[in-house]
Every structure is written in C-alpha cells, then in structure tokens.
Amino acid sequence: MHARFAAAFSQLPAELQAALTPVMASDTFNAVITAAQVDAIGHACHLDRQALSFALLPLAAAYALTPISHFQVGAIVHGASGNLYFGANMEFSGTPLQQTIHAEQCAITHAWLRGETALASITVNCTPCGHCRQFMNELNSGTSLPIHLPGRHTATLGDYLPDAFGPRDLQIKTLLLDPTHHGLMLDNAASDPLQQAALDAANASHAPYSQAYSGVAVETPRAVYAGRYAENAAFNPSLPPLQAALILPNMSGDNVNAIRRAALVESRQAPLSQYAATRATLQALGCNDLQHHPL
C-alpha cells in the first residue's frame, strides 16, 4: 500500500481496514473502487454506499498535492456504473494558482477519463467552492446532481447553485461526460503511443463553445497518461487538457514530476490554443519535451 495512505488508513476501524487492504494494497490500485468491491466491502463492514464513501474521504484526501495551501480536500464520485472514483486538490509550485485542480474537478475528470458517462452523486469533505459548483453545472446530470457532505443533509447542485447559468442557456446539447468524437486525424499517430493517446483525448474532449478540441498525453517511466479539455459555459472554470492528464498519474501512484515527454493535439482553426500554458506548466514540473500537433 502506498505510504501516502498510512496516517489516514490507521484511523479507520479495524473491520474496514481488513476489507480494504486486499483492494488498496494491490499494485494495480488506481484510486477506483469497482461496484463489486463496493458491495463486498459494504457487506463485510455493514456500511451502505454513502456511509462507505464518507469513511473513504480521508483516503481520497491523501492524494492531495498541496505545496502552496497545505490544505487537503478529498472528493469521491459515485459513477452510474456503481464504481467510486477518488479525487483530491492538486497544486503545482512555480505555476499560477489558476493551474490548480480542485478536488471535485479531479474526481469528476478522473471518472470521465476512466470511461464513466454519468454520475449518481459526489461526496466531498468540504463545501464546494463557487468554481466547482459552476464546473459541475456543465455535467449531463445538471443541477440535479446530489452532493453529500459530512454532517449535513444531502442537497443537490441546484441547492448550492440557484439561478444557475450553464450550457442549457446557450442551447448546448452535448454535455460533459456525454460520449463524443470530433474526427481529428494525425498522420502516423499510431507509430507513437504518446501521440495516439493525445489524439484520442482530443477527439473525446468537451469544447462546445470554442471548438478548441484538445488533448494532452504525458509519459513517465511507468506509463502514458492522457487528458482531455473540459470547457465550461462560464469559461474560467474550464479544465485544461494538461491538468486532466496530470490527474491520472497522481491517482495511479505515479509522480507528476517524473514526466519525460508530452504531446498536445489541438484544433488548428480554434480561436484559442493550449500550447503556451501547457508548455509553461510542464516546464515547472521539469519537462521540456513537448510535441505540438495543431490539426
């Protein structure tokens, strides 16, 4: 089991520790607890799904990277599949605060990148900030998404974000988490797994306002990870593709400071580009090898 969990794990009831150990001690654990595992753990510990999620929040918060705030936030997304996806806030030294990934963004994007196409609810250890409320309003669940907080009655996103402005006000039909494919093509991408991963991510990205479809793939000594752009009706809460890509190595127990090379695929004709911000953030993380493929 990864050392990051030691303190939080030691505080769990012994029965829950015993049920979780086979799952979390696995070398393949990637911050996802499958529906079958949720049922088995809940049965062994006499916990329903929501009680289990509350108990797991400290483990989700253990994924936080907080060199600036030193304040850990954990979130757990309940996918429509029954899986639970961990998320935590991620900050990056040497970059503007705007490059921060909030815990709710992390958990939701984590679920999206793992193939989830709808959410049942989200559980967070702190009240969602306005930025995250607006980010969640881009989801295909809309304002009906249930939000669970310790010590509070369950409320919906609509309760936290009344009179919301979102994609439906702009007649956007394809929403965040809806499957899509933009038809971008890159010659010889199949010869390089990094390029292919970035291309696949760009084709699945959500950018209905700018059509700036984009994806980033990063390579560490362990694996290639890819992330997609998640645009927002309010613009500023949009999550850049690099940030999405950085979620996966962190959730997989890898090191975001161990990136050897990266690739950005994006629409050439779009009114904006991810290149400058992607390059600057990668350089802050110690990576200077960025391939750029405008299509």
Swiss-Prot record:
Binds 1 zinc ion. Zn(2+) binds at H102, C129, C132. Its cofactor is Zn(2+). The keyword Zinc applies. Belongs to the cytidine and deoxycytidylate deaminase family. Homodimer. PANTHER family: CYTIDINE DEAMINASE (PTHR11644:SF2). This is Cytidine deaminase. It comes from Edwardsiella ictaluri (strain 93-146). The lineage of its organism: Bacteria, Pseudomonadati, Pseudomonadota, Gammaproteobacteria, Enterobacterales. The gene is cdd.
